[in-house]
Amino acid sequence: MRKWGIVFLAVALLLGDAATGWAVDFKVKGSWQFAFDYINGGNFMGKNRQGSHQIGQQWAAIHQKRDEFEAIQRLHLQLQAVASESLAGVVFFEIGEQRWGMSAQGGALGADGSNMVKVKQAYVDWMPPHADLKVRMGLQGVRLPGFALDNPVFNDDVAGITASYAFNKSFGLTALWMRPYNDNWLDTADNGVTADYLDNFDLFVLLAPVSLDGMKITPWAMAGGMGPNTLKPFTVRNAAGNSKTFTFNNPSSQAIDGLQMRDGLFPAAFSSGRGGASLWNTAYSTMFWGGLTGEVTAFSPFRVSWDFIYGSVDNGREYLNRQGWFGMLLGEYDTDWGVPGLYGWYFSGDDDNPHNGSERLPYVATTNNLTNSLSSFGYRGHPIMGGGKGVLGTNPNGTWGVGARIKRLSFMDDLSHTLRVNYFGGTNDPKMAAYITGRRPMDGAGRAVYRNNTDFNSFGTYLTRSDSGLEINFDSTYKAAENLSFILETGYIHLWLDEGTWGRYENIAGDSLNYKDAWKVSLNVIYAF
């Protein structure tokens, strides 16, 4: 309760100062969010490799031992101090998530959580006089562009500076510097002598949106450098069957974001004849992404949109490098009763060589408030909380798929529905499964294999060309009042996993994998003000 008091005391002081004569207009908005989720089979396992019942579920692509039914709440509170049309400051508090009954999150009897109040965003917006330039400085939400699909490379809160200039109504330019990490390395091995040294991670973005009659196009590029100490210490452990696993330090208080750095910028498994400290890069990692996204609405009510992205990361060792691409095409038709659409996507996948790096598209972070329009169960279809999302992963990396959907399907006032049906498969070589599961602890040249993932569902889903799946969503939104909404989500996922690829360890004792379907029912209640 102490931190709650601090938040509302700050609000009172700000509003009180405004009354003393400052020409500042204070605005408050936010939302109370409640989620009641039931998920069955959220990790797609009935029994694990050892034949034991596998509990828990995947949420936002990471295994968590969570109950099948959960009740969760969260409060978003945004304060805006507006001095003029050209100057304003914003602070965005997030209180929760709080799982009902969980003491550590303040949801147990007494409700005294000690770490639930977080500053999600805090920035200043400024426009110089007589210029069409907009500057945003501070902790802010950044979402790279995507017209067909929410961008699968970066979508998160981050510290940085954004500058946008409009040359005219048709053409603009946006530049952005972001600093995801810095000064987090403790260097315990050297008594802290070189702590916080070479551990910065910086990204630079350039966007050039073009708006014409009936068409919008946005080419964009992002480049960056990551210090060799950013994710230290690197840890290698011996696993069953003489295989090895690797993990990195997690410099983020949001564990999911930190784990995504490992999963998004490095291979799922690699092989090397090196050992010890020489296994890793000692210089800055460099990275680049380039994309082209757009939509055509000239033939309204028919709309076509597309995305294309290429990305590469050089981690200083061939086996640690990663490069890949992604493309998607969407066509939809707007009617009085809904918006039916067809779409298809393709992400490049790994080949069968763990020594030449990864061929999957690299990414940085895509969890925070992600609205992935592909689905609301396998991925995060709505920017609302709840455990019933992201069981396939944070994005469809390493997959291809086709789908059909109907958005805004409505036959009565204040009630709308979304229906999605997706059929998808993996684009990774089936031989990679043997390295990921530890069945093959060495590559064909006798080099040791180090694996980040440990199974098809250890961090998101790693699907091969021998695997496929089907997902069905039916989601309904009822607007009970101007500020009150009820959202009911239902979802079902079936995976066809190739038994020859994933079914049994060859060198490790254990039963064959027993996988199961996943399904959910989730009710969200949102009061927005």
Question: Where are the regions a protein language model picked out?
Answer:
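Transmembrane beta-strands of outer-membrane beta-barrel proteins
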Residues: 26-34, 77, 89-91, 133-135, ...
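Surface-exposed loop and membrane-interface regions of Gram-negative outer-membrane beta-barrel proteins
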Residues: 38-74, 78-131, 135, 143-153, ...
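C-terminal outer-membrane beta-barrel translocator/porin domains of Gram-negative envelope proteins
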Residues: 341-343, 347-398, 404-407
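Outer-membrane beta-barrel "beta-signal"
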Residues: 35, 515-529
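Signature for the C-terminal beta-barrel architecture of outer-membrane proteins
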Residues: 130-135, 148-357, 404, 423-425, ...
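Flexible internal linker/loop segments at domain or repeat junctions
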Residues: 367-390, 428-460
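Cleavable N-terminal export/targeting peptides
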Residues: 1-25
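Exposed, low-structure sequence patches enriched in small/polar residues
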Residues: 389-392, 397-432, 516-518, 522
